[in-house]
A protein has these predicted regions:
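Domain-core and long-helix interface of multi-subunit machines
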Residues: 1-43
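C-terminal functional module detector
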Residues: 26, 31-181
Length: 181
């Protein structure tokens, strides 16, 4: 069985994610296609086969072996990345640069730059109600994105909190991420 075998819409085969954790196995994504690949995947629209990201320390066969033995892998399918939390957090932080922060008494505007070829879907989570910002954001690959935060009730700053809904470290739960403003 495969970790990414189709399940109910928006889900992946979570039992195998738990098995990887319990058995201390690296996560490996594959695709099992028996007909020409173009019948299932539309490359012209940016679709891709399921694949494995291997986070190596050196670009060599030994570097790949060492990363697999230490479970530094992620599965990439559709727009989802499935991995241990530490690798997802590092992937996100290395992908997104904060290019600019503009602040005045009533608002903060953060300009982000996504330097990767991945799309990130952010959903606002529990936060200080004096920080007012949109509920959901999509940060496209190789693009800039602005997050505008209104400051209400004499709030000077705090944490903006998100779930990155397409980065999975646990079944059906995206990576939680906070940024101090």
């Amino acid at each position: 069985s495969e970790i990414t075998r189709p399940m109910a819409p928006g889900h992946f085969n979570a039992i195998f994610l738990s098995d990887c954790d319990a058995l201390e196995l690296p996560m490996i994504g594959t695709s099992d296609i028996h007909q020409p690949i173009q019948t299932d995947i539309d490359f012209a629209r940016g679709q891709h086969r399921t694949m494995t990201f291997v986070f190596v320390r050196e670009r060599s066969a030994e570097g790949i072996r060492e990363a697999l033995l230490h479970r530094r892998t992620a599965v990439y399918m559709d727009e989802k990345v499935i991995a241990e939390e530490q690798w997802l957090k590092e992937l996100f932080e290395k992908s997104i640069d904060i290019e600019d922060i503009k602040r005045n008494e009533k608002s903060i505007v953060i300009t982000l730059k996504n330097n990767s070829d991945l799309t990130f879907h952010l959903k606002k989570t529990r936060h200080n109600p004096g920080l007012v910002y949109f509920r959901e954001y999509t940060i496209q690959p190789q693009c800039r994105h602005r997050i505008e935060i209104r400051l209400e009730n004499n709030i000077q700053g705090g944490d903006i909190n998100f779930e990155i809904t397409n980065l999975y470290a646990a079944p059906n739960k995206g990576l939680t991420y906070s940024y101090k403003v």
